[in-house]
């Protein structure tokens, strides 16, 4: 399992648009991908509803975890996606 931590820079947090973009990117990989909220609750990154239900807000510290055969590639792609869309 690989993971990284980040701080949410998007002023609205993780809302419908970034959740949709993340879920779409995550679905390209076989690994299990989880976003861990500051409360410790985990959400499946491949699920838009799961991501939005976490209530991630501006300045929240999050952890992204990947576990599986392509975990390194998946984690790098998710991080790049978050940075490209100015979420982190």
UniProtKB/Swiss-Prot annotation:
GO biological process, any: phosphoenolpyruvate-dependent sugar phosphotransferase system
Keywords: Cytoplasm, Phosphoprotein, Phosphotransferase system, Sugar transport, Transcription, Transcription regulation, Transport
Cell compartments where the protein resides: Cytoplasm
GO CC list: cytoplasm
List of residues that carry Phosphoserine: 47
Top-rank taxon: Bacteria
Keyword Transcription regulation: yes
Location, primary (coarse class): cytoplasm
Function comment: General (non sugar-specific) component of the phosphoenolpyruvate-dependent sugar phosphotransferase system (sugar PTS). This major carbohydrate active-transport system catalyzes the phosphorylation of incoming sugar substrates concomitantly with their translocation across the cell membrane. The phosphoryl group from phosphoenolpyruvate (PEP) is transferred to the phosphoryl carrier protein HPr by enzyme I. Phospho-HPr then transfers it to the PTS EIIA domain. P-Ser-HPr interacts with the catabolite control protein A (CcpA), forming a complex that binds to DNA at the catabolite response elements cre, operator sites preceding a large number of catabolite-regulated genes. Thus, P-Ser-HPr is a corepressor in carbon catabolite repression (CCR), a mechanism that allows bacteria to coordinate and optimize the utilization of available carbon sources. P-Ser-HPr also plays a role in inducer exclusion, in which it probably interacts with several non-PTS permeases and inhibits their transport activity.
PANTHER family: PHOSPHOCARRIER PROTEIN HPR, PHOSPHOCARRIER PROTEIN NPR
Name of the protein: Phosphocarrier protein HPr
Species of origin: Mycoplasma genitalium (strain ATCC 33530 / DSM 19775 / NCTC 10195 / G37)
């Amino acid at each position: 399992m690989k993971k990284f931590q980040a701080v949410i820079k998007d002023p609205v947090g993780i809302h419908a648009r970034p959740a949709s973009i993340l879920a779409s990117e995550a679905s390209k990989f076989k690994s299990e991908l989880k976003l861990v909220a500051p409360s410790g609750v985990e959400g499946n990154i491949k699920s838009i509803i799961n991501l939005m239900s976490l209530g991630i807000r501006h300045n929240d510290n999050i952890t992204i975890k990947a576990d599986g055969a392509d975990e390194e590639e998946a984690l790098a792609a998710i991080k790049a996606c978050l940075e490209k869309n100015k979420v982190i």
